[in-house]
């Protein structure tokens, strides 16, 4: 047993240096707090243990929001991606989502270097095994080597490491992701402090050798010609991109899986943890959708300096020899060489309703949770929570008001509100359908929504803020110009409109009104707009969206105004729900457990009815009129 010694004093200690831990540590340090980040292995900083991608549907929104607030994820992927695509372009702008294929090692190395060079930040390869708490307030952490680091706040960003258990068919052993060590001691410390834990499960597919793949039997998927960056600070990225490939399962794949389903830990009871609904294993897909003739499988490179390829959509915990047989049924993989075996991993996570909207634990002052510890899944969800936890831990130490994003502010607000208000019984994944105001929460306007907030907090630099103000002014000035510029029904203009399958003008209208026609866009009208200033492409895209969706946007703004009325009705911190006459027993229990900060949050708690909300509103009126 190690002899304890004084490791030093810090303002904030971050436990874990994955995507949540990196954002938390950088936010804290950049806000001037003396910060320590602890990781089991320095080489696992910003590790991508599963898919080699950043972004995707709804997740791309999160990355843009992290960037708009002054986080690092967007800039890091812009510097290290090997393919970029905008998804859902056939649909409306609310669901357009950027997705980039990462060079995994480059992504890690760059993020590690950013942390190493950051002022106010120290990094240690060390395992935290215990939290020190006095009188309900965190005072430090204890490590396996005996170091005691005193601090004012701790951010837990432990990923899937807490009591991690790897499962492959009949084989199981204690382990973290990607062959790393688990963290087996910290869970007990949390239990001793009264924190409620439960077991979740996730998994990752096999990795294969590129030399053994016949790409001629697959469908090639290229990146976009016009590369759109994640970060609002990145400009005009030109880069040679790699291809990804698409193949499909077939009857033979299904037969092998069905013949061996009894050896699947998911189906024979070996796995106790709850897995992600929206990222099922291939055996789960086959059994849950027996009538589906085939499933898409994506073959994606893991980087430029490796031949490893990721088999997306083929996550499994079946025995290794079964996995090899399954892989060889896929067109193009008949002679495949498996380099890494697919596995499932079980791990401890918390019930996130134990957290405040700031991500601080309700019953342990100065202790924050972020990422998969909180029951979420995904790099982007983790990064978003880490950023907010880092900001709020720093603001609390500075005795400033916390940053709480609402559901009408950001996808980050939806994510955190869902976790701390509703909780989750499975790994939570962000989706556009979870956001009520998604037309307002587009990925293209994240800076308009959040950069002012990031600037006020102190995380957005002057350079970024000046760039944002210039972009904002460009859009506002151009919209005003279009509203005041008339288009006359001249012959040449009507001929131009007819060429674009648009109706002739019967009377003079403004360019703004003309642009509201669905068949026209801002870039089309350049030919008849000689006064147009030279503006960046992203400004033109904003003009298109703001003109064409003006009515829908206004409608959602009105909905948000109603939503905010309830969000502004704050509930007293010391409220005793048992004393409020008229509340149902279930509502009293749920409200006492969640302890919502506002009537708005109370309305979203499962088990709290509209009648209960009416009782609360009457109570509040009497409370504030005393």
UniProtKB/Swiss-Prot annotation:
SMART domains, per the entry: GIDA_assoc_3
Alphabetically ordered keywords of this record: Cytoplasm, FAD, Flavoprotein, NAD, tRNA processing
Residues annotated to bind FAD: 16-21
GO CC entries: cytosol
Cofactor entry: FAD
SUPFAM superfamilies: FAD/NAD(P)-binding domain
Domain of life from the UniProt record: Bacteria
InterPro entries according to UniProt: FAD/NAD-bd_sf, GIDA_C_N, MnmG, MnmG-rel, MnmG-rel_CS, MnmG_C, MnmG_C_subdom, MnmG_C_subdom_sf
Protein's name according to its UniProt entry: tRNA uridine 5-carboxymethylaminomethyl modification enzyme MnmG
Pfam families named in the record: GIDA, GIDA_C_1st, SAM_GIDA_C
Listed GO biological process terms: tRNA methylation; tRNA wobble uridine modification
Ranges in coiled-coil conformation: none
Species whose genome carries this gene: Clostridium beijerinckii (strain ATCC 51743 / NCIMB 8052)
Binding residue positions for NAD(+): 275-289
Localization in the cell: Cytoplasm
Self-association state and partner proteins as the record states: Homodimer. Heterotetramer of two MnmE and two MnmG subunits.
Biological function: NAD-binding protein involved in the addition of a carboxymethylaminomethyl (cmnm) group at the wobble position (U34) of certain tRNAs, forming tRNA-cmnm(5)s(2)U34.
Keyword NAD in annotation: yes
Record's keyword annotation contains Cytoplasm: yes
Family from the record: Belongs to the MnmG family.
Gene Ontology MF annotations: flavin adenine dinucleotide binding
